[in-house]
Amino acid sequence: MIQGVIFDMDGLMFDTERIWATLWEPALAGLGLSYKEGLDEAARGTAGDSMRAVLRRFYGPDCDPDRIIEALHEQGVIAFQAPPPKKPGLDELIAYLEAQHIPMVVASSSRMASILRHLNNWHMTDHFQALISGEQFSASKPDPEIFLLAAEKLGTDPAHTLVLEDSYNGVRAGAAGGFVTVMVPDLLPADDEMRGLYTMECTSLNEVLAKLKTGEL
């Protein structure tokens, strides 16, 4: 039985990943660098040392990953002045979980300022027991540490805690932590690796809600 739910944010709650994917080129161009194919996919869902490792892999050990990350986030502040669209089924899922007295946490690789901006724009902050940002950790997703802290905030065992994720790195983190991990794909479909890791794949948050109601989750 599910006793708590952990939400990723970008690409799961809000339709933001498509926008982030377009921000790499201007961010890198401002630093005299060009976008390299596969960077967005490799970096998606990461933060901190995990993202730095990705950037060094693409741009070499002598690159300044923090400068690139800061340039990317500067582009994000401009791009997200208007609230991004909510994913279909988000409001209904949250309402159901609240009615069932199932606590919820947001655990995102994004900066806390970004998490607060999106949630406050939609007046959603009060629905969650805690908000956890990847910038709080040296190792973010695919390391499970962020989800383990979320479970601690919920007061639930990972085996009875649902992780909702769209990214490969998020699914890897959920599986590594022993969580009930459901992938709701956004930009990238599930591949063989993901199918070997997740508990279930759902096409939308509406399907997650349906599975909870029928007891399949």
State where each predicted segment sits.
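N-terminal helical cap/lid subdomain that shapes the substrate entry/recognition surface
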Residues: 2-100
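Conserved G/P- and acidic residue-centered "switch" motifs that form tight phosphate/ATP-binding loops
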Residues: 8, 12, 108, 166
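Structural motif
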Residues: 42, 107-109, 164
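Functionally critical, cavity-lining and gating residues within the transmembrane helices
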Residues: 48, 108, 112
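Short, flexible loop segments at the rims of nucleotide/cofactor-binding pockets, characterized by
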Residues: 80-85, 109, 178-179
